[in-house]
Design a protein with these regions (language model features):
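Residue-level signal for well-ordered alpha-helical segments
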Residues: 30, 34-37, 42-49, 53, ...
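N-terminal regions that are enriched for targeting/export leaders
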Residues: 1-52
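Serine/threonine-rich low-complexity intrinsically disordered regions
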Residues: 2, 6-7, 29-32, 36, ...
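Long, contiguous internal "core" modules enriched in hydrophobic/ aromatic residues
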Residues: 4-16, 20-21, 115-238
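Residue-level detector of alpha-helix boundaries and kinks
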Residues: 38, 57-58, 177, 216
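Transmembrane-helix bundle segments that line or gate the permeation/cavity pathway
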Residues: 41-142
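Non-cytosolic membrane-interface motifs at loop->transmembrane helix junctions
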Residues: 34-41, 69-71, 170-183
């Protein structure tokens, strides 16, 4: 009980410090508030998308090595509500974050980059991800459902990266950018899982739910996706 209270007190203290820093930053540099909220919202949403991808792949392939770790990626999508709040604040209260809300766009680009359609699409992405999380956390989640989730993630992840990030510079387009961002989401999720597993082992060395082999598998997966992300970054740079 004492340890739990100490942990909760530490979390509250860090949360209070973060809140003070956020408020100070918002007051001192108001022009940075929108971009910073967007960065935080996209990062939290990316953690959820990467975790959903990991879980869906495990179900589709019938992998058993990660069964005792499934709770971690199943809990990561809990960041989606906070991501939704942050992103909606940007879209509704700080539209100046996107230059196309000020500059008039013409043709199909003008239709696609209209605020109502943009907000509706973003809400659809977030809603589908929340639904996918509910479907994958069911005890009897089938490989067919997981395959459908992978298809949804591929389409919505590609569109979300284009809408939320690439449209910051509407004159610039790239066919590989969305893939690069999606792989970055997976890297973030696997890294969060690995850090959580290490934290569990440090706090409870006798815990058998996280084995050395599982840590090595997660580390190998993190290295592989990091190399892929770096390769895509280089391709994007070139």
């Amino acid at each position: 009980m004492t340890l739990a209270r100490h942990r909760d007190g530490t979390i509250l203290a860090f949360a209070a410090i973060a809140a003070v820093i956020a408020i100070a930053g918002a007051l001192l540099q108001t022009e940075r508030l929108g971009p910073n909220l967007l960065l935080a919202g996209v990062y939290l949403a990316g953690l959820a998308v990467g975790a959903l991808f990991f879980t869906a792949v495990q179900v589709v392939t019938g992998a058993t090595w990660s069964d005792s770790l499934r709770t971690i990626p199943e809990k990561l999508p809990l960041t989606l509500p906070m991501a939704t709040v942050l992103l909606l604040v940007v879209f509704l209260a700080h539209p100046e974050t996107y230059s196309w809300t000020v500059e008039q766009q013409s043709g199909l680009r003008g239709v696609w980059l209209s605020r109502p359609f943009f907000i509706a699409r973003s809400s659809l992405y977030l809603g589908l991800w929340m639904l996918s999380a509910r479907l994958l956390t069911r005890p009897a989640a089938s490989s067919r459902v997981a395959a459908g989730v992978l298809a949804v993630l591929a389409l919505t992840g590609w569109l979300a990266a284009s809408d939320w990030l690439m449209s910051l510079t509407p004159q610039w387009t790239s066919t590989i950018f969305s893939v690069y961002v999606f792989v970055g989401f997976v890297v973030s999720a696997v890294a969060a899982m690995l850090l959580t597993c290490i934290w569990v082992r440090v706090r409870n060395p006798t815990c058998r739910s996280v084995s050395e082999g599982q840590l090595r598998d997660l580390a190998t997966m993190l290295l592989g996706f990091s190399c892929l992300w770096a390769y895509l970054w280089y391709c994007q740079y070139m």
